């Protein structure tokens, strides 16, 4: 697991998006004190990542 800080939002669970040449799919979400954190599946490497808009 690692964190990617980026600028995007408005994704629902199940939505896919492209970031740094990889396709991600949002599989869960929760609101933290300092912002919104999404858990995603990174298809190309088949690993979970935390994606945190800043």
Regions found by a protein language model. Name each.
Residues 12, 28-31, 51:
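Intrinsic disorder/low-complexity signature
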Residues 1-12:
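Mixed-charge, Lys/Arg-rich low-complexity intrinsically disordered regions
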Residues 18-45:
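Basic/aromatic-rich interaction segments and small domains that mediate binding to polyanionic partners
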Residues 6, 20, 51-53:
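Intrinsic disorder/low-complexity segments, especially N-terminal tails and targeting/processing regions
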Residues 1, 40-54:
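Intrinsically disordered, low-complexity, charged/polar segments
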